[in-house]
Amino acid sequence: MSIEETVIELFDRLFMEDVSEMMDEDLFDAGVLDSLGTVELIVELESTFNIKVPISEFGRDDWNTVTKIVQGVEELQHA
């Protein structure tokens, strides 16, 4: 399963949201993510992809779409 597919599956499991058609939509503005959801997502991303997401790098504007989240995971895997 690709990173993109896994991230989409995480959103479905954690938030019961199908974000597959919302790849570039702001997930905060759409009501999919909030502060608590962000923490849940970070924990799941770290566990699923065996990465460490520095809170200082998890800016709302940098991780607000599925596409940006996938790119962030890819960058952290290659860091």
From Swiss-Prot:
TM segments?
A: none
Tell me the function of this protein: Carrier protein involved in the D-alanylation of lipoteichoic acid (LTA). The loading of thioester-linked D-alanine onto DltC is catalyzed by D-alanine--D-alanyl carrier protein ligase DltA. The DltC-carried D-alanyl group is further transferred to cell membrane phosphatidylglycerol (PG) by forming an ester bond, probably catalyzed by DltD. D-alanylation of LTA plays an important role in modulating the properties of the cell wall in Gram-positive bacteria, influencing the net charge of the cell wall.
Q: In which pathway does it act?
A: Cell wall biogenesis; lipoteichoic acid biosynthesis
Q: Which GO terms describe its cellular component?
A: cytoplasm
- What organism is the protein native to? Streptococcus pyogenes serotype M1
- Tell me any Pfam family this protein matches: PP-binding
GO MF, any single term: D-alanyl carrier activity
Q: Which UniProt keywords apply?
A: Cell wall biogenesis/degradation, Cytoplasm, Phosphopantetheine, Phosphoprotein
Q: Give the record's PTM text.
A: 4'-phosphopantetheine is transferred from CoA to a specific serine of apo-DCP.
Annotated protein name in UniProt = D-alanyl carrier protein
Q: Where in the cell is it found?
A: Cytoplasm
Q: Which gene encodes it?
A: dltC
Where's it mainly located?
A: cytoplasm
GO BP term (any one): cell wall organization
Residues where O-(pantetheine 4'-phosphoryl)serine is found: S35
